[in-house]
UniProtKB/Swiss-Prot annotation:
Pathway: Fermentation; pyruvate fermentation; formate from pyruvate: step 1/1
Keywords: Acyltransferase, Carbohydrate metabolism, Cytoplasm, Glucose metabolism, Organic radical, Transferase
InterPro entries named among the record's database cross-references: Auton_GlycylRad_Cofactor (IPR050244), Form_AcTrfase (IPR005949), Form_AcTrfase_GR_CS (IPR019777), Gly_radical (IPR001150), PFL_dom (IPR004184)
A Gene Ontology BP annotation from the UniProt entry: glucose metabolic process
GO molecular function ontology, one term from the record: formate C-acetyltransferase activity
CDD domains: PFL1 (cd01678)
Name the UniProt record assigns to this protein: Formate acetyltransferase
Domain PFL: 5-618
Length: 748
């Protein structure tokens, strides 16, 4: 790359390296970031403009709630990068501009994932999809959803309906792809286009199916970058060139992200790892006297504000799975470099400080990459903000850095990937608790009585025998792993074909790592059920057709969540065993198998789909979220509960292990300083035990009960659920009750 005057000016004062000639954002960061080990005294409060704009956002949020959850919606124009004119909150006050349509809070219509879903989303809120648009995407332009259902087998459809596999991204955008939006700020769009053209022209000329597909994808990526430049022009910016200062760097990066969410409505549209990158520009401008600390914070606050108002039109079925209108604009903060230097900067503080300046909020999904080696002042600040807002999640950087290096980000909730070098095929999750019931009933569904799994004689004994049950369970997991992977192969083939993420992939290297991100639900239910069968006496109760529909338990049994190796080892074995079975099946585009123990809020849906289980859980009752112990069963205090979850091996769950943890304030200590110190010590201990992820809620149950009864008094009450945060008042009452029923630890 020949450095133009634009590049020379934009990069003035930066240490040079390979990144000057080639795309290498990581090297740019490592050469130029400034470690900050001080405290939070430098932080600035909100400016008048920030307060005015946030008041406007809160008023729009109030109006949206009053209108039933939808402020306005586009029913005619299919959303693309350039489909809508520029939109503003207040053009004269905003330091960072850009919204998804021509108005803030107006939701776009995105039909490429499925016209039926677009129509259902409209109708759910009293809107009507434009008939001509519906005709186009029904008769002339096939969608992802239609492609998937054209290819599904009857077996797959039966599994989907029964809920032994559910939440599949066949009726919504898959998401969980992180474009390296930093590249637009550092290099400008023109250089990125040059690189894609170069890759296209140097590809193999042996026209295999793989080569043909990649050539078409590269062409689409190139066109999307042209559209991105046009989006910049709509807002008055020339983003063909690199950003020359901090304000431009934030704006350029945000426009790249905005382009992605204008074109895709994936279940998780995550941001990446931007705070340390942007701090390099802020520090240069501060050192040169071109900007003040207050101006830097104002720009960050306005950036965060934009990320808070990302919105998609969703169907009621989607909202059952992922409740509370989440978008998973996940920003990964902190961590430690492979050279041992913490990557904490002043911007790490500024991003978290937005929780003070704007108040708590679920988005962006602020994720601290925790290491025992983070600066102590930053640890204390994180703890303080967690106790104050319950808006932060923590993920073990010491664990992930070994696999992903020091320039990875978190997609959605707990899924690590190298920024710009790796993407995943999101796969929802298989229901291990229901699979156990299928093993007992010879493949018949315990709720419908239909033959869904492979047919064999159900267990006939009057008392369940552990060895007999487990032998059949293993066979059922063999079958489930196969139908699961095959379903995902269809889904992602069709998503690439009919709803390709061209802009997000344009901000990746051309040659990337792909993972097939499977998942499991009901781990604690399955582990406790097997523990009950092994250590107590479990008698199956059959209906008139001989189907086991309930269980009678005599005696006690070890329960997952109490640091009891007898049952914890069952949970570990299930995870390792199912992952081995998944790996035996070929994946689309030779993607690497990964797995998560994560449910989002679909633990409620899974519970509805699953009958009585041998652990004593009743039909329809919610599962525990993620890798959590079942509600109320972790009775030996916070540390024992954490110890059980920390045993789940990350090596076979590299898509993440979610643990949502609630503790009452007094159990952390009487004084603020003690609470902060105790929480950081707990996080350090969990990290040293190889625990992967921790959502932390610090509040009393009574607060949530009051918010249920008086939602108007709690417009910004934020809680952490399985892998994300949510406005508590946006949950359904059923989900609110589920949250309230969970364990609130009153002792360490």
């Amino acid at each position: 790359m020949l450095e133009t005057n634009n590049h020379t000016n934009a990069w003035q004062g930066f240490k040079t390296g390979r990144w000057n000639k080639n795309i290498d954002v990581r090297e740019f960061i490592q050469l130029n970031y400034s470690l900050y080990e001080g405290d939070d005294e430098f932080l600035e409060g909100p400016t008048k403009a920030t307060e005015t704009l946030w008041d406007q956002v809160m008023q729009l949020s109030k109006e949206e709630r009053e209108r039933g959850g939808m402020w306005d919606m586009d029913t005619k124009v299919a959303s693309t990068i350039t489909s809508h004119d520029a939109g503003y909150l207040d053009k004269d006050l905003e330091k960072v501009v850009g919204v998804q349509t021509e108005k803030p809070f107006k939701r776009s219509m995105q039909p490429f994932g499925g016209i039926r879903m677009a129509k259902a989303a409209c109708e759910a809120y009293g809107y009507e999809l434009d008939p001509e648009t519906e005709k186009i995407f029904t008769e002339y332009r096939k969608t992802h959803n239609q492609g998937v259902f054209d290819a599904y087998s009857r077996e797959m459809l039966n599994c989907r309906k029964a809920g032994i596999i559910t939440g599949l991204p066949d009726a919504y955008g898959r998401g969980r792809i992180i474009g390296d939006y930093r590249r637009v700020a550092l290099y400008g769009v023109d250089f990125l286009m040059e690189q894609k053209l170069k890759d296209f022209n140097t590809m193999s000329t042996e026209m295999s199916e793989d080569v043909i597909r990649l050539r078409e994808e590269l062409t689409e990526q190139y066109r999307s970058l042209q559209d991105l430049k046009e989006l910049g022009q709509k807002y008055g910016f020339d983003i063909s060139r690199p950003a020359t200062n901090f304000k431009e760097a934030v704006q350029w990066l945000y426009l790249a992200y905005l382009a992605a969410i204008k074109e895709q409505n994936g279940a998780a549209m995550s941001l990446g790892r931007t705070s340390t990158f942007l701090d390099i520009y802020a520090e240069r401008d501060l050192q040169n006297g071109d900007i003040t600390e207050q101006e830097v914070q104002e720009i960050i606050d306005h950036f965060i504000m934009k990320l808070r108002i990302v919105k998609f039109a969703r169907t009621p079925e989607y909202n059952e799975l992922f409740s509370g209108d989440p978008t998973w604009v996940t920003e990964s903060i902190g961590g430690v470099g492979i050279d041992g230097r913490p990557m904490v900067t002043k911007n790490s503080f500024r991003f978290l400080h937005s929780l003070d300046n704007l108040g708590p909020a679920p988005e962006p999904n602020l994720t601290v990459l925790w290491s025992t080696r983070l600066p102590e002042n930053f640890k204390i600040y994180c703890a303080k903000m967690s106790i104050k807002t319950s808006s932060i999640q923590y993920e073990n950087d010491d664990l992930m850095r070994e696999s992903y290096g020091d320039d990875y980000g978190i997609a959605c909730c707990v899924s690590a990937m190298k920024i710009g070098k790796q993407m995943q095929f999101f796969g929802a999750r298989a229901n291990l608790a229901k699979a156990l019931l299928y093993a007992i009933n010879g493949g018949k569904d315990e709720k419908s009585g239909k033959q869904v799994g492979p047919s064999y004689e159900g267990i006939k004994s009057d008392v369940l025998d552990y060895d007999e049950v487990f032998e059949r369970y293993e066979k059922m997991m063999d079958w489930l792993a196969g139908v699961y992977i095959n379903s995902l192969n269809i889904i992602h083939y069709m998503h690439d074909k009919y709803s390709y993420e061209r802009l997000e992939m344009a901000l990746h290297d051309t040659e990337i790592i792909r993972t097939m991100a499977t998942g499991i639900a009901g781990l604690s239910v399955a582990a406790d059920s097997l523990s009950a069968i092994k250590y107590a006496q479990v008698k199956p109760i059959r209906n008139e057709e001989g189907l086991v529909t309930d269980f009678e338990i005599e005696g006690d049994f070890p329960k997952y969540g109490n640091n009891d190796s007898r049952v914890d080892e069952i949970a570990v074995d299930l995870v390792e065993r199912f992952m081995t079975k998944l790996r035996s099946h070929k994946t689309y585009r030779n993607s690497e198998h990964t797995m998560s123990v994560l449910t989002i809020t679909s633990n409620v849906v899974y519970g509805k789909k699953t009958g009585n289980t041998p652990d004593g859980r009743k039909a329809g009752e919610p599962f525990a979220p993620g890798a959590n112990p079942m509600h109320g069963r972790d009775q030996k205090g916070a540390l024992s509960s954490l110890s059980s979850v920390a045993k789940i091996p990350y090596d076979c769950c590299k898509d993440g292990i979610s643990n949502t943890f609630s503790i009452v304030p007094k159990s952390l200590g009487k004084e603020e300083a003690d609470q902060n110190k105790n929480l950081t010590s707990m996080l350090d201990g969990y990290a040293m035990q190889h625990g992967h992820h921790l959502n932390i809620n610090v509040f009393n149950r009574e607060t949530l009960i009051d918010a249920m009864e008086h939602p108007e008094e709690y417009p910004q009450l934020t809680i952490r659920v399985s892998g994300y945060a949510v406005n508590f008042i946006k949950l359904t009452r059923e989900q609110q009750l589920d949250v309230i029923s969970r364990t609130f630890h009153e002792s360490m």
